[in-house]
Amino acid sequence: MDFLSILPPQRHCTSELCDNDESVQAIISALEYTGLAKILTETFSADEFVEALDARLLYIAHIILSCKETNVPINTDTFLCPLAERIKVDVDDLNAGSLKCMKVLLHHCTNRYFIKIVEKMTRGQSSNLLWFLVRNELVTGSSVVKQCSYKPGLNSVAHGIFRPASRFEVFGKVHEPIVRDVIATFVERRPIPVSETLGLLIDPFSGTFGASIDLCYGIEEHDDGFVTVGERAHVYEIKCMARYIYSAADVEGFLDNPTLKGFASLIKGATFPLIEHRLPGATPSSGAHIVSHDRMFETNRKRKSIYESNDYVRRLLNINRGVKSTVYIFREKPQPDERDKLTLECLAKFTANIFLNARHKYFDQTSMQYFVVTQHYINDHPDPECIEPDTLPRVSVVTALFKTRNIGTHHSLEVNHKTYPNSAIPFALIVTPVAFDAEILSVFLRETFDNYAQQVYNKSKIRLWDPNFLRGFVASHRELEKTP
């Protein structure tokens, strides 16, 4: 079965609200007419210095007020009621002209509370219209490229929402929930902390950087619906490899006797192997997201031997070269006492020298996730100055490989008590921990912030600033001094 051909076409935003084109188009038109620069220009004087977090909250307030005024069916009161309480006005009196009233909130550390509200309101990510709107003009993993460089979004908000999703994106959206449940069942062996996909996480100190997380353990959802990041949180970035869907016949022999050597042979059999082999000290290409020095993954294909890389990339490659990934191998089997359902069993688990390629765009994405989640951990910690480096968040990339179903098998797949009809079958997960360098990441983030602030100034003549947003991040990576 060709799963890519039978998946129904989708728009990039799968929210049912997008079917109400008149309402959605109204809010999109309002945002594209104004934008962050125009909001700042109308609120502040030329050359005035504005903290980046304050600027972000003004823009988010504008977005949510625009949703209210254009009757987009979003519960805007979740954000507007606490906002009205803070600036001492009636929530029904809040409108686009109220933004200047928000100047009384400038420089308030309690403004970080609104960042938590945004996360709660944007759960579901691409199935949530507000996630697209609030994400606009944020620095995210998709707007950074090639380490220490930044490019603003070139496409309009409307393009991001209404563009057709590629068949690979659709495959990922359909199968990512399955992988989350596989991780919960076989890797973490505990329930998923937040039932819905986490919403947009915005850096609570700068308000400039954002990240969307596929799955995170070590967070806690409280009675008010807000989440806090605890010690040793573990972020899983899921990659469903739609380009590598194996037929059931191709993997049957391997699943009968799963070994690391057999897995390597399966990987090498692809026209463009998923895992790129490189000798120690050699620089990988930017095409494959995972690399190995193990000769088990070596192919006879000729590869370019020299690739350009800067000192930062070489340092990142060096600290990741020794990383060991864990490979899980699965096979479907009939669900006991339920003949019309399939479940998964773990056939084997082994470790291998497979690490994330610092030249690949996924490294930029995971770096942003690591930074933003760490900032939330610092913000949520009762005593940030006492944070130990070994309590900081971790990030792993989960590469999921799928196979077609056996001929004649049409039963639903059940994983973690959830049912998935007509899906491909996950038969391998490669869980790859990622190592980061706080010094390199801090340099990149500072350069990115300055670049972003300059672009905002060019459009608005307002100077965004935040000289200290990296202070806690840098300090948290230093070992605490031992007291006698």
UniProtKB/Swiss-Prot annotation:
Keyword Metal-binding: no
Its EC number(s): 3.1.-.-
Annotated Gene3D superfamilies: 3.90.320.10
GO CC terms, sorted: host cell cytoplasm; host cell nucleus
Residues flagged as site, Required for function: 176, 214, 237, 239
Domain of life of the organism encoding this protein: Viruses
A Pfam entry, by short name: Viral_alk_exo
GO molecular function, one term: exonuclease activity
Subcellular location: Host nucleus; Host cytoplasm
Alphabetically ordered keywords of this record: Endonuclease, Exonuclease, Host cytoplasm, Host nucleus, Host-virus interaction, Hydrolase, Nuclease
Similarity-based family: Belongs to the herpesviridae alkaline nuclease family.
Subunit structure: Interacts with major DNA-binding protein; this interaction increases the nuclease processivity of the alkaline exonuclease.
Protein's job: Plays a role in processing non linear or branched viral DNA intermediates in order to promote the production of mature packaged unit-length linear progeny viral DNA molecules. Exhibits endonuclease and exonuclease activities and accepts both double-stranded and single-stranded DNA as substrate. Exonuclease digestion of DNA is in the 5'-> 3' direction and the products are 5'-monophosphate nucleosides. Additionally, forms a recombinase with the major DNA-binding protein, which displays strand exchange activity.
Official protein name in the record: Alkaline nuclease
